[in-house]
């Protein structure tokens, strides 16, 4: 009844107008699952490989017809007839078929699309929403959103070197209340920027991309907007940064080209520490470069007891790199991006390893997204307590927030909003 009988794939467009892979999986009993694969702008060197065609005559070489063909030929031949309810076996079969350590032959975009669509089809067979199918009865924690309201770095065309400035409504009473708070801050910020003569265009993830001179200038606007919206910074709302430091780490130093500054590894640690003292910043993602393990350790020893330090490019949702971080006491949180590793099974393994080691996990989108809202379900299924899915603009971002609102409604009295407990450094305050 739950055997995989057909798999179809197609080339669709993501939120940046670039091609991506969408996969449909059909089961013997007629159950159906569909998944679309996201794509990143600032990608870590250690991520699984996203297979692109390289044909400059189509989509400037970014087509994904090779990945689509892999799904409908080799992958279908390999897993057709397998039981969709045996997710691990399905994913392992695709990984073995690919035969490379980073999914470079078939493409992580091909394998992930099938992996997620299989899970959705199996959930339909079971008559369960995806979060319940994956997480069981324990999946009931609604995550605190990291709402990216100011964009810089690779996500915007402005002088700000840091990639994301986010608000986290830890003082909300529910997920829907958190979304309301974020939306009110977002619109208040828009008014403040407009009043100060800045443009209110948005970046890839829906946050504003004003022509501000520094991180401090962006943080000041965010703080002003939190207060003006009627909330208390540090209590109702805390701040989070994604420095995406790999993007500006060159020749052993952190080169802030937008700000005209160069900082050594030690100076980068000092700078981030000072920012956390000046502003209610409780989470910093990729404050150091992906292979600057020395800098990461210095940063962790310096502020890790009071700030969540999230490894994105550092860990790339990979259990081998995460294990090294745990062993060396580097960072204390992992950003979870399904397409960094390329299958649902491996994603869940990374979350499990992190949680067992006392690390937090943050479920995350990519800058190139679609209307697919799978990560909302996975955030609840894994009880990770935090989700990073962009700003309060652009339907590709709002699809995830709206799905979380639906999940919260479906859970009813069982729903539990993570709130202050989501960040361990904040929970005891």
From Swiss-Prot:
EC category name: lyase
Residues at the catalytic site: 205 (proton donor), 337 (proton acceptor)
Binding positions for (2R)-2-phosphoglycerate per the UniProt entry: 163, 337, 366-367, 388
Listed pathway(s): Carbohydrate degradation; glycolysis; pyruvate from D-glyceraldehyde 3-phosphate: step 4/5
GO MF entry, a single one: magnesium ion binding
InterPro entries: Enolase (IPR000941), Enolase-like_C_sf (IPR036849), Enolase-like_N (IPR029017), Enolase_C (IPR020810), Enolase_CS (IPR020809), Enolase_N (IPR020811)
Subcellular location: Cytoplasm; Secreted; Cell surface
Cofactor binding: number and manner: Binds a second Mg(2+) ion via substrate during catalysis.
Keywords, comma-separated and alphabetical: Cytoplasm, Glycolysis, Lyase, Magnesium, Metal-binding, Secreted
Primary subcellular site in the record, as a coarse category: cytoplasm
EC number: 4.2.1.11
Biological process terms in GO annotation: glycolytic process
Transmembrane segments: none
Recorded family membership: Belongs to the enolase family.
UniProt function note: Catalyzes the reversible conversion of 2-phosphoglycerate (2-PG) into phosphoenolpyruvate (PEP). It is essential for the degradation of carbohydrates via glycolysis.
Name listed for the protein in its UniProt record: Enolase
Organism: Methylorubrum extorquens (strain PA1) (Methylobacterium extorquens)
């Amino acid at each position: 009844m739950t055997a995989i009988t057909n798999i179809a794939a197609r080339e669709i467009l993501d939120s940046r107008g670039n091609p991506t892979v969408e996969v449909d999986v059909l089961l013997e009993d007629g159950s159906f699952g569909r998944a679309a694969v996201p794509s990143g702008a600032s990608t870590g060197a250690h991520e699984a490989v996203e297979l692109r065609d390289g044909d400059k005559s189509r989509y400037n070489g970014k087509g994904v017809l090779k990945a689509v063909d892999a799904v409908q030929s080799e992958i279908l031949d390999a897993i057709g007839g397998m039981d969709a309810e045996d997710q691990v076996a399905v994913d392992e079969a695709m990984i073995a078929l690919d035969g490379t350590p980073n999914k470079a032959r078939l493409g992580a975009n091909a394998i992930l699309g099938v992996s997620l669509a299989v899970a959705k089809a199996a959930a339909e067979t079971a008559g369960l929403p995806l979060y319940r199918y994956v997480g069981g009865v324990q999946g009931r924690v609604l995550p605190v959103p990291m709402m990216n309201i100011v964009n810089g770095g690779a996500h915007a065309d402005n002088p700000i070197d840091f990639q994301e400035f986010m608000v986290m409504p830890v003082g909300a009473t529910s997920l829907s209340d958190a979304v309301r708070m974020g939306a009110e801050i977002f619109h208040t910020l828009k008014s403040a920027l407009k009043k100060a003569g800045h443009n209110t265009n948005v970046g890839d993830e829906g946050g504003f991309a004003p022509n501000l001179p520094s991180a401090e200038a962006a943080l000041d606007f965010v703080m002003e907007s939190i207060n003006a919206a009627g909330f208390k910074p540090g209590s109702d709302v805390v701040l989070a940064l994604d420095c995406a430091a790999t993007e500006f780490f060159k020749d052993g130093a952190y080169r802030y080209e937008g700000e005209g500054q160069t900082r050594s590894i030690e100076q980068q640690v000092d700078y981030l520490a000072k920012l956390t003292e000046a502003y209610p910043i409780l989470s910093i993602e990729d404050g150091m470069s992906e292979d600057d393990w020395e800098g990461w350790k210095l940063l962790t020893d310096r502020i890790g007891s009071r700030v969540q330090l999230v490894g994105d490019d550092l860990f790339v949702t990979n259990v081998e790199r995460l294990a090294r971080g745990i062993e060396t006491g580097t960072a204390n949180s992992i950003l979870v991006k399904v397409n960094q590793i390329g299958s649902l099974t491996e994603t869940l393994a990374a979350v499990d390893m992190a949680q067992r080691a006392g690390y937090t996990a943050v479920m995350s989108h990519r800058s190139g997204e679609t209307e697919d809202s799978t990560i909302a379900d996975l955030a609840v299924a894994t009880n990770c307590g935090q989700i990073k899915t962009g700003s309060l603009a652009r339907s590709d971002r709002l699809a995830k927030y709206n799905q979380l609102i639906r999940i919260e409604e479906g859970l009813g009295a069982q729903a539990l909003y993570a709130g202050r407990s989501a960040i361990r450094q904040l929970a005891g305050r």
